């Protein structure tokens, strides 16, 4: 990991190269339109603001589209992040699986009312219901509606959430990309 640099950034373009590895984003402002956090890295986001931009669509944005490989223990973990934007209410989704083994966990996050009640999309990949791992723990805000989440989204216990500390996630093995 490189030293932390202050500031924020705009999500990469759609076809920018992504490299598997471990990444830490702390106290960042991350802004984009659609799938603006994408790739196969194991990444930990701590105290970040994720800002979704309005595209004037029925679904304006997806914050994440993990392309996690099947042999990775972790994908994206968001800890104490704020999920905001300038989109109308209920027009943004937290995540959709780029690959069917997508992993994204949201811990202690503030979720604005622009997030849909279901929160997550299977992107018409029903097989991902058995293979992806989406989870939430101790989130709050108008966009956190756990009783409306799909059955494949886990609501973690405190003990389960302890498996997603920064130390555990960033020290997990990173395997080469699958062929």
Language-model features, listed with the residues they occupy:
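Sequence-level preference for short, compositionally simple segments enriched
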Residues: 1-179
């Amino acid at each position: 990991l490189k030293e932390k640099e202050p500031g924020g950034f705009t999500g990469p373009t759609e076809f920018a190269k992504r490299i598997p590895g471990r990444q830490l984003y702390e106290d960042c402002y991350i802004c984009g339109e659609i799938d603006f956090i994408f790739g196969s890295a194991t990444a930990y986001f701590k105290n970040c603001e994720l800002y979704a931009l309005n595209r004037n669509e029925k679904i304006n944005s997806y914050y994440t589209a993990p392309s996690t490989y099947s042999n990775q223990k972790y994908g994206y973990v968001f800890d104490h992040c704020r999920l905001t934007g300038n989109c109308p209410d209920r027009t943004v989704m937290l995540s959709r699986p780029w690959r069917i083994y997508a992993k994204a966990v949201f811990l202690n996050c503030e979720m604005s009312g622009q997030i849909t009640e279901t929160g997550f999309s299977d992107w018409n990949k029903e097989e991902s219901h058995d293979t992806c791992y989406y989870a939430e723990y101790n989130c709050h805000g108008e966009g956190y509606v756990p009783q409306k989440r799909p059955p494949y989204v886990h609501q973690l216990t405190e003990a389960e959430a302890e498996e997603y500390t920064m130390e555990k996630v960033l020290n997990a093995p990173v395997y080469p990309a699958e062929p």
